[in-house]
Structures are given as C-alpha cells and as structure tokens.
Swiss-Prot record:
Entries under SMART domains matching the protein: RPOLD (SM00662)
UniProt-listed GO biological process terms: DNA-templated transcription
InterPro entries, alphabetized: DNA-dir_RNA_pol_insert, DNA-dir_RNA_pol_RpoA/D/Rpb3, DNA-dir_RpoA, RBP11-like, RNAP_asu_C, RNApol_insert_sf
Family, per entry: Belongs to the RNA polymerase alpha chain family.
Native organism: Colwellia psychrerythraea (strain 34H / ATCC BAA-681) (Vibrio psychroerythus)
Protein name per its UniProtKB record: DNA-directed RNA polymerase subunit alpha
Alpha N-terminal domain (alpha-NTD), as annotated region: 1-234
One annotated GO molecular function: protein dimerization activity
Catalysed reactions, semicolon-separated: RNA(n) + a ribonucleoside 5'-triphosphate = RNA(n+1) + diphosphate
Role description: DNA-dependent RNA polymerase catalyzes the transcription of DNA into RNA using the four ribonucleoside triphosphates as substrates.
Keywords: DNA-directed RNA polymerase, Nucleotidyltransferase, Transcription, Transferase
NCBIfam families the record matches: PRK05182.1-2, PRK05182.2-5, rpoA
Length: 329
C-alpha cells in the first residue's frame, strides 16, 4: 500500500559485492520508480568526471626532443611509451605533485617497479609495462605526476605554457579520475504490495588507487553537497523598512496645558509638578484628592477630559519618563 504522496521511500545499502580488489558491485534498494536511473546516471557522471586523482602530466626522456620520434634500443616509439605512462596508477600523500625517475639499461621490460620515488609516493600497479629495451638499449626519463580532477588534454596546457616550455618536455593528456569503468543497472524491487519500485546496482572498477566502496561514498558526498544549495533555497524578499514605533503615545508627551482645564485645576496640577499628560495619567484619584484646592469637581473635570482622549487616571507607564522629556527638563 502506498503511503502519503509527499513521502518517499528511503533506500538502504543492501550489499557490496567485491568482485576483485579493484572492482565492486554496490546495490541500493528500494527506490521510488524512476529514481534508479536518476541517481545512477548522476553518480556515474560524478565518478567519471569529478573524482580527484593523480596522473602523469609531463615526461622528459634523454635524447628525445619530441613525441613523433623513436629511441634506439627501445622497442616502442615515443607515442606508445607516453600512452603506457598514462596507465600508471600513482598515489601522492601530503603533496600535489612529484617527479619520478626511471633509469634502466639491458634487454627486457621496463615496468613501474623500476621507478624511483620518495616515501610519500605509492605505485599501485608495479607490474605495469612502460617500454621494452632491446639489445644494449637504455633509457632514462623523468616523469611528472600531479593531482587533479577530470580530464585535461595536453593541448590545454600547451597553449598556456608554450613560451616557457623547454625543448624535450613532452606533455601528456591527463585523466585524473581513479575510476576506470562505471556502469549501472536498474532492476525491479518490491516492498509489501508495491512492485513498481527500483533497485540500483552500480558496477565499478578503479585503477587501484581508490577503494570502490570509498569512491561511491565520495561521489555521493559530492552530489549531496551540490544539492544542499537547492535544499536551502529561499524566496528572496525585499527588506521592508519598518517604521520604528514610538515607545509612548505622543499625547502622553504633551504638556497638561493642552488639556485646556480650568485655571483652578491647571494651577493645582502645576503645584504638584505635574507637567505632562503622562505624569497625570499615572496618578490615582485618591492621590489627586490630597492635592490642596483640588476638589471632587476638579477631579471630575480631569477625568472627563482624559476620557475624551482615550485616557484615564491610574494608568501604568513603564520606563516613564522618556529620555526626551528628561533632557528637556
């Protein structure tokens, strides 16, 4: 039975099948109908294009001036050697680039295991063949490895470095992603009576520098962080200029003379230092009757005048008197 139309099923990680040290299958279910392709395609694109990794970016080979040449005593031509170097799986720890060296002579293959490097560099595929020496052949090369993301063709860097690039520095197309292959499949899933749900199976292979499960976790984190901007999206409202409301009704700040009381009543209030209407309304009837020469007739007059202005005796005014009155006094 389907729940509320505003509620969506939350998938769970069903299992991780390790096919090999570099390949794994990750299964997620149940997903709402159509979400299998939505999430599968998004994760696939991120895994292929947005995962950081290391790649060979430059190579210098002794005796070689450009890539369209060959080297005596080496079976492969220079272009083939560069293609083989692109297959190196390197891990850099604590730095963004490193220069590796290879020096070897004598007949036989030159592999990644022959590379000399620092302790903060790891070669994940030491059996990878770089080239093959024949007879008395020898080779010496310097390999620059950098950290990056996505795919950066050599032509993009060649234009920027043309003036500074030394002769013999061979630029290499760099594919930084540690993910070699990623595919996904969407199967049917069932929860209770619902049979229209999706099951997402991600089949991924890396170059050995990153665990497949960790790659999925990183890709999911990247996707979630990018979507956060939409989750926090709010309508942009114009800031309204709110007029500051006065602390007291303006009538309370006016002098008692504005009440136009009789001379007798006005003089009695002045004798008691009641200067403002705000002072007057805080007085109680009993208190005013104690004022010399102010009788019940004057009290009735004061009450009637205040009532006509929506005021009365015995009111409580917090923070009275205001600073403006104190300053004027």
């Amino acid at each position: 039975m389907q729940g509320s139309v505003t509620e969506f099923l939350r998938p769970r990680l069903v299992g991780i099948e390790t096919v090999s040290p570099r390949r794994a299958k990750v299964t997620l279910e149940p997903l709402e109908r159509g979400f299998g392709h939505t999430l599968g395609n998004a994760l696939r694109r991120i895994l292929l294009s947005s995962m950081p990794g290391c790649a060979v970016t430059e190579v210098e080979i002794d005796g070689v001036l450009h890539e369209y040449s060959s080297k005596e005593g080496v079976q492969e031509d220079i272009i083939e050697i560069l293609l083989n170097l692109k297959g190196l799986a390197v891990i850099l720890e604590g730095k963004n680039e490193a220069v590796l060296t290879v020096t070897k002579s004598g007949e036989g293959p030159v592999t990644a295991a022959d590379i000399q490097h620092d302790g903060d560099v790891t070669i994940a595929n030491p059996d990878h063949v770089i080239c093959t020496l024949t007879g008395e052949g020898s080779i010496s090369m310097r390999i620059k490895v950098e950290m990056g993301r996505g795919y950066v063709p050599a032509s993009a860097r060649r234009d920027a470095e043309e003036e500074d690039r030394a002769i013999g520095r061979l630029l290499v197309d760099a594919s930084f992603s540690p993910v070699v292959r990623i595919a996904y499949d969407v199967d049917s899933a069932r929860v209770e009576q619902r049979t229209d749900l999706d099951k997402l199976v991600l089949d991924m292979e890396t170059n050995g520098t990153l665990d497949p499960e960790e790659a999925i976790r990183r890709a999911s984190t990247i996707l979630a962080e990018q979507l956060d901007a939409f989750v926090e999206l709010r309508d942009i409202k114009e800031v309204e200029q709110v007029e500051e409301k006065p602390l007291f009704d303006p009538i309370l700040l006016r002098p008692v003379d504005d009440l136009e009381l009789t001379v007798r009543s006005a003089n009695c209030l002045k004798a008691e230092a009641i200067q403002y209407i705000g002072d007057l309304v805080q007085r109680a009837e009993v208190e005013l009757l104690k004022t010399p020469n102010l009788g019940k007739k004057s009290l009735t007059e004061i009450k009637d005048v205040l009532a006509s202005r929506g005021l009365s005796l015995g009111m409580r005014l917090e923070n009275w008197p205001p600073e403006s009155i104190v300053d004027n006094d």
